Swiss-Prot record:
Residues 239-252 have a biased composition (Acidic residues). The proteasome is a multicatalytic proteinase complex which is characterized by its ability to cleave peptides with Arg, Phe, Tyr, Leu, and Glu adjacent to the leaving group at neutral or slightly basic pH. The proteasome has an ATP-dependent proteolytic activity. May play a role in thiol biosynthesis and arsenic tolerance in association with PAF1/ARS5. It comes from the Eukaryota. The modification N-acetylmethionine is found at M1. This is Proteasome subunit alpha type-1-B. The keyword Cytoplasm applies. CDD domains: proteasome_alpha_type_1. It is found in: Cytoplasm; Nucleus. Belongs to the peptidase T1A family.
């Protein structure tokens, strides 16, 4: 049986119980630039890779403000993400106007999942080709959700979506146990380091990433480029210091005629620096 017999309509099931159009939408998420979210007890940090179509164009926005206590990062079709973020903003405003209180994050995520799920049941609609990391803060604490094109949603301590996101997930899995008690500064640093993991050797600069923060008594806002670059500089100096220390230890042991050996060792350390992952 050929797949193209069952992937022409989103409401057509394959004999193996699969909806190929929904799976294609989920694959679109993997093609987008990486987006990362982390949360502690009091803060949520969203970060993404800035991707431009060419050197002459500006990058597309991948993080949107929904309300003072909610933000969303997307991976996949940016146009779909823009439409859904506008829907989320409308839901938040309507709730605030009606009940005079902020919209709980979990309730907004359910509304968003229901909207996405309807597109998997109508033959004249297509699934949204975008994944959303929804971060927010309400009376029950900080939350981070992932909304899938299939209409499913999951809550995470930290998560990454998009292209090359597996490298970021590996980094987050190594450190996720400490995120709950982390400070805002530590969350920002871990988010940027996770972004670096997705670049696969490309030099990390503040212009390549966007970072947003929200927390207790701290409305949603974006970090400026200077603040991001300062964080990058703090952990970019660490490999250099280790390299200098290695050269200093090698010099007393080296023979007078082997002065070049220490330099070769230093360049070897540079080759295996975290930037090359």
């Amino acid at each position: 049986m050929f797949r193209n017999q069952y992937d022409t309509d989103v409401t057509t099931w394959s004999p193996t119980g699969r909806l190929f159009q929904v799976e294609y939408a989920m694959e679109a998420v993997k093609q987008g630039s990486a987006a990362i979210g982390l949360r502690s007890r009091s803060h949520v940090v969203l970060a993404c890779v800035n991707k431009a179509q060419s050197e002459l164009s500006s990058h597309q926005r991948k993080i949107f403000k929904v309300d003072d206590h909610i933000g969303v990062a997307i991976a996949g079709l940016t146009a779909d993400g823009r439409v859904l973020s506008r829907y989320m903003r409308s839901e938040s405003i309507n709730h605030s106007f009606t009940y005079e209180s902020p919209l709980p994050v979990g309730r907004l995520v359910v509304h968003l999942a229901d909207k996405a799920q309807v597109c998997t049941q109508r033959s004249w609609k297509r699934p949204y080709g975008v994944g959303l990391l929804v971060g927010g803060l309400d009376e029950s604490g900080a939350h981070l959700y992932y909304n899938c094109p299939s209409g499913n949603y999951f809550e995470y301590q930290a998560f990454a979506i998009g292209s090359r996101s597996q490298a970021a997930k590996t980094y987050l899995e190594r450190k996720f146990e400490s995120f709950q008690e982390s400070s805002k500064e530590d969350l920002i640093k871990d988010a940027i380091m996770a972004i670096r993991e997705t670049l696969q050797g490309e030099t990390l600069k503040s212009s390549l990433c966007t970072v947003s923060v929200l927390g207790v008594d701290e409305p949603f806002h974006f970090l400026d480029q200077e603040s991001i670059q300062k964080v990058i500089d703090t952990f970019e100096k660490v490999p250099e210091e280790e390299e200098d220390a290695g050269e200093g230890e090698a010099e007393p042991e080296a023979a007078p005629g082997a002065a070049g050996t220490g330099e070769q060792g230093g360049s070897g350390d540079q080759d295996v620096a975290p930037m090359e992952i």
